[in-house]
Amino acid sequence: MLVIISPAKTLDYESPLATERFTQPELLDKSKQLIKICRDLTPVQISKLMGISDKLAGLNAARFGDWQPKFTPENARQALLAFKGDVYTGLHAQDFSEDDFDFAQQHLRMLSGLYGVLRPLDLMMPYRLEMGIKLDNAKGKDLYSFWGEQITKKLNEALEQQGDDVVVNLASDEYFKSVKPAKLHGELIKPVFLDEKNGKYKVISFYAKKARGLMSRFIIKNRLTQREQLLDFNLEGYAFDEANSQGNELVFKRPEQ
């Protein structure tokens, strides 16, 4: 089973590390090409491109300038411990054992605008480069054209290494658009998380993001490898809704909190 999640805009390079082990990202040659393009952007251009404040644009211009492999624990941090958004709140990797990290390293992948695909223990320097932005490059007008089939190829390599053929898509639409589903060597499963509000069930962004992290945690902690095992997901009040699930879309509902 291969679990795919999105990165986060918020980063944490301060908290104590849950593990000292690390690996290097596998697509750094591609990342270098993007950094070269980004270094030519002024803070004003970065602000406009990313829709962020002048202060954040200045910070990210500095990050592009400081970026340099080879990464070390002194200048970088493991991806799973560096990202800090709602998904990662649900994942809560801070209490992972070394065995948990071993399983995650094999079965979890984070998509990234700059790094393409990250394994949990891959070191990364801080950055902001969302997959959906329009960044001119040699391959086209955006990062989807830049990455092409590279991301799908890496995901297939991971599937081949683990000998499984189940892919759990817990990434956002913006990020999963970088994957070519027809070329994935596995059955694609998409969990959907619905929360009750005023008597109606719907996707509530904050809760849905956290739930993606919770399901990732559930898979890692319980060493899941089969599609059927996902139906037992029950963290924080969610339960499988067979009646509303269709094909490879698995619906999980939670009553109003």
From Swiss-Prot:
GO cellular component terms listed in the entry, alphabetical order: cytosol
A Pfam family annotated for this UniProt entry: H2O2_YaaD
A Gene Ontology BP annotation from the UniProt entry: response to hydroperoxide
InterPro entries: YaaA (IPR005583)
Similarity field: Belongs to the UPF0246 family.
Stored NCBIfam families: PRK02101.1-1 (NF002541), PRK02101.1-3 (NF002542)
Name used for this protein in its record: UPF0246 protein Spro_0686
Organism: Serratia proteamaculans (strain 568)
